[in-house]
Amino acid sequence: MKFPDNHFSAAIVADTLSVSKRNVETWTQNGKLVPALDPNIHEKPYTKDQLETFEQFSAMFNSSWCEEMAVEPSRSYSLVELFAGAGGLALGLEQAGFKSVLLNEKDKYACATLRANRPNWNVIEDDIENVDFTHLNGKVDLLTGGFPCQPFSYAGKQLGFEDLRGTLVFEMARAIKEIKPKVFLAENVKGLAENDGGRTLSIIIKVLEDLGYKILEKEVYKAIFYKVPQKRERLIIIGVRTDLYDKLAYEKPSPYYKVLTVADALKAGELYDVDVPESTGQLYPERKAEIMSYVPEGGYWRDLPIRIAKEYMMKSFYLGGGKTGMARRLSWDEPSLTLVCTPAQKQTERCHPSESRPLTTREYARIQTFPDDWEFKGSVGQIYKQIGNAVPVNLALAIGKAIIRMLNAAPKDVFE
């Protein structure tokens, strides 16, 4: 159910504070949170007045989002992007004010998408290990990349740059070494921060520092704070060349004023001017569509009648555990779950809130905050994959504006 702008559901409170709905219910029972009283509303919302005592809500209610989005580059800032995919990160950075000079991507369908939308972009379609970046040495302001993180063996030793040879981490580090950009932005799954107790990330950070960079930011960003209607989380690493460390100061972007929902993505409103256009998409087999019709909005397999739940889950039904992604239907009034490379995968179901079908490709794109005129190339499966792997455009925009502000504030000699 949709509440007034100064009222928030338990689900939105939980998402914002990174706690479970059960936590919110417990706080309500012990008086830490007191929902608004309205006999006409079954689900009692929480008000702005009591939520602003939480740091996350206070930051939203007192945000400088509009002022930060209004900042324009004071000079031309150049961008190189690695592992560019379908262009979510590059597009957001373009909207922030960066000018792309080179994008590298090996997937032919993603490259076709990039060229269809930005014919003027210099898209290098090749494996990154075949690309020479030395001609850009000292000429690039920002290098970015969402590098796929492959496992590497360290066997108790302290690894350096050459020890990572053969991995995509090495190739991104090589590009940084050859280009020597003023700033780099690396993004990855949030799990990288916890992999091997943080050892993998520590090795990557050390290699980047050994190449002559200081880390300004190393944090997991929640996309819901940056005008993205999706519970996506990404590890963001921002580094600056050591000789510029005392001249550049990064400040994390302010959050958007509210958490957007699936309804904001698919219906006309503050995110899009019109309802989502029709587009291609996968369909369920007839029996699966029948089964999903029993799942209520926001529900999952545990909401199925017991007989149907056993049929659908098979052996998994008896194994216990949450398995909350199975037979999962999205809710209109909550952000989407993190999009994956296919909306109909059994373990990570992404069913439309009110229709018994997977999300279409354009619905997928909207939840990732791509504009409706961004055209994707390839088969339906390839398009889902491109969108599911992308950085949300609005998240990239927010980070890009923060980097623009940092560069604008730098002394002139940084660019001489």
Swiss-Prot record:
The active site is at residue 149. The keyword Iron does not apply. SUPFAM superfamilies: S-adenosyl-L-methionine-dependent methyltransferases. Pfam families: DNA_methylase. Residues 77-410 form the SAM-dependent MTase C5-type domain. It is an enzyme of class 2 (transferase). One of its GO terms (molecular function) is DNA binding. It catalyses: a 2'-deoxycytidine in DNA + S-adenosyl-L-methionine = a 5-methyl-2'-deoxycytidine in DNA + S-adenosyl-L-homocysteine + H(+). Keywords: DNA-binding, Methyltransferase, Restriction system, S-adenosyl-L-methionine, Transferase. Its EC number is 2.1.1.37. GO terms for biological process: DNA restriction-modification system; methylation; negative regulation of gene expression via chromosomal CpG island methylation. CDD domains: Cyt_C5_DNA_methylase. InterPro entries: C5-Methyltransferase, C5_DNA_meth_AS, C5_MeTfrase, C5_meth_CS, SAM-dependent_MTases_sf. Belongs to the class I-like SAM-binding methyltransferase superfamily. C5-methyltransferase family. This is Type II methyltransferase M.PspPI. It comes from Psychrobacter sp. (strain TA137).
